[in-house]
Regions:
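Amphipathic alpha-helical packing segments from all-alpha helical-bundle domains
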Residues: 16-20, 96
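Short secondary-structure junctions
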Residues: 22-26, 107
Length: 159
């Protein structure tokens, strides 16, 4: 199995776990502001940065057609702006998943990250990106468990 095959498998596995968390999130939790960042915001943040860092460099990033700049971080929403629905976030996750194979296949794993603030090569960027997915997926799984013992199954690898 090649390194790129392993990377693609781990992207798909981590995003499959994120998808489970999103799908299992009760509607009452989706917009819940008892946490600093509502569930939907953490899920969207995770997906946009996964998508972003799959690109060769910042200038090559093509945002999702529904992208809203203010949603990618954790700053307050612009007045009157509605959050993304669960269906919209899942739509974006699928777009990201659909691009994993082509984006990873095109990588020069020995090349620079492509992002000046990340001083390592493309191979390490893939680990960094997958760890980011799992950090926030774990955060969302913890919320689900605390809310009502809702469990997300472990996905070790995905074809």
């Amino acid at each position: 199995m090649s390194v790129k095959s392993v990377i693609k498998s781990q992207y798909r596995a981590s995003l499959a776990m994120l998808r489970q968390a999103i799908e299992k999130c009760p509607e009452s939790m989706w917009l819940d502001t008892s946490y600093r960042n509502p569930f939907w915001r953490v899920a969207y943040h995770t997906i946009i940065y996964t998508h972003f860092y799959l690109h060769p460099k910042e200038a090559d990033f093509v945002p999702w057609k529904k992208h809203i700049d203010e949603f990618q971080g954790f700053n307050p929403l612009p007045e009157g702006q509605q959050p993304f629905t669960k269906a919209e976030v899942l739509e974006y996750l699928e777009l990201c998943l659909d691009q994993v194979d082509d984006k990873v296949d095109a990588l020069d794993l020995e090349g620079e990250s492509g992002f000046y603030w990340l001083p390592f090569n493309k191979l390490e960027l893939q680990f960094y990106n997958i760890r980011h997915v799992m950090q926030h997926t774990g955060e969302l799984c913890e919320r689900l468990g605390a809310h009502g013992e809702i469990e997300v199954g472990w996905v070790g690898m995905a074809k």
